[in-house]
């Protein structure tokens, strides 16, 4: 009887450890701003890209900041449609030695503080070759810290025929695009999230 109880106790402990391990993997942090500066928790650094690469005149600035008590990456700028331009973006390359494999996750989680404007989240994968191609999803960010969850199913390919392969993520970008406006978006956390089994 004693040995049976011991076996039962061991099984309980092992199952608890397994549940804890699975729960710890429900979110994979890519950047929580703990590295400081423009460096991400993933190791790569954020960089500013504007439509100047194609002759546009939009102006942008990317910096580390603190907004409402939280350390964040801050993207600011004025988006202009002149010269067939129209975007500023904060881009994080995630390929490193190999592309980021997000196949086991449901989508991307953002903790952001904005200015009431609509922004895009763009993904580039190994299937994306041309600079204007990306998989896009939109979100609106009010002037308050809040969490945005964007499922991978919400992304649409822009000028690309291949379906989104989240197993080969090479870049994630926060983008102000498509209309003339003043951008001001702060990011405190970027992560991959996994929906709980049986959850919504």
Which residues does each PLM region occupy?
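Beta-rich carbohydrate-recognition modules and glycan-binding surfaces
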Residues: 2, 19-200
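Bacterial N-terminal signal peptides
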Residues: 8-18
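Bacterial N-terminal signal peptides that target proteins for export
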Residues: 1-9
């Amino acid at each position: 009887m004693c040995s049976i109880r011991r076996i039962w106790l061991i099984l309980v402990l092992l199952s608890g450890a397994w549940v804890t391990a699975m729960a710890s993997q429900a979110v994979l942090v890519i950047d929580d701003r703990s590295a400081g500066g423009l460096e991400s928790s993933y190791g790569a650094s954020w960089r500013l890209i504007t439509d100047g690469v194609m002759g546009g005149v939009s102006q942008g600035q990317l910096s580390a900041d603190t907004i409402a008590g939280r350390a964040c990456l801050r993207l600011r700028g004025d988006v202009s449609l002149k010269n067939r331009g129209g975007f500023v973006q904060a881009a994080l390359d995630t390929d490193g030695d190999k592309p980021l494999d997000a196949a086991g996750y449901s989508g991307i989680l953002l903790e952001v503080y904005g200015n009431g404007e609509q922004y895009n989240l763009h993904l580039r994968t190994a299937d994306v070759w041309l600079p204007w191609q990306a998989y896009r999803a939109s979100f609106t960010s009010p002037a308050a810290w809040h969490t945005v969850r964007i499922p991978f199913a919400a992304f649409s390919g822009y000028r690309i025929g291949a379906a989104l392969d989240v197993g080969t993520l090479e870049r994630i970008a926060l983008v102000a695009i498509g209309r003339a406006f003043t951008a001001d978006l702060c990011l405190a956390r970027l992560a991959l999230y996994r929906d709980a089994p049986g959850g919504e």
